[in-house]
């Protein structure tokens, strides 16, 4: 059985992780590739009241069920299909709906804390950090949350200043040191993305 290549992509909210992920997937034609988003693995909060769930800090590592993510990745590397959880943002807890996820040649683990957990890092063949200026990240987050999630500009800015930025500085930015590849300017850095995808193509072909 062909070995599974696991690629980790981390970076702050709005850094361009999705763009980088899409470029990798586009450049790995001929291989089966799938995204395993860390956002799928927010912890189940059904034991909490709705008001208690509203207090959840989604920008803290504790919000994620890394044990389940690691277990799922181990099974996938061993050729076993898994049921991946999904999250219901309206009720602020895990959904009853799961995704049937089959083993692939390449699995991309993408999320703000993709490089924060050592056990998870050690499972990765390539670790990438998408590094983007803070001003650009907040502008992207403003656009996304106001247009796609119906939030007011004030609420997004307040959350950024009180939670997102402090959590980024404390937990996300320090994980940059674990990256094999750092992509400055995020998804707009075509030269870095081309070099990175060429390296990944070579690695996957050898597996």
From Swiss-Prot:
ATP binds at residues 11-18. One of its GO terms (molecular function) is cytidine kinase activity. InterPro entries: P-loop_NTPase (IPR027417), PRK/URK (IPR006083), Uridine_kinase (IPR026008), Uridine_kinase-like (IPR000764). It is found in: Cytoplasm. It is an enzyme of class 2 (transferase). It comes from the Bacteria. It catalyses: uridine + ATP = UMP + ADP + H(+); cytidine + ATP = CMP + ADP + H(+). Pathway: Pyrimidine metabolism; CTP biosynthesis via salvage pathway; CTP from cytidine: step 1/3; Pyrimidine metabolism; UMP biosynthesis via salvage pathway; UMP from uridine: step 1/1. Its EC number is 2.7.1.48. Keywords: ATP-binding, Cytoplasm, Kinase, Nucleotide-binding, Transferase. GO terms for cellular component: cytoplasm. Belongs to the uridine kinase family. This is Uridine kinase.
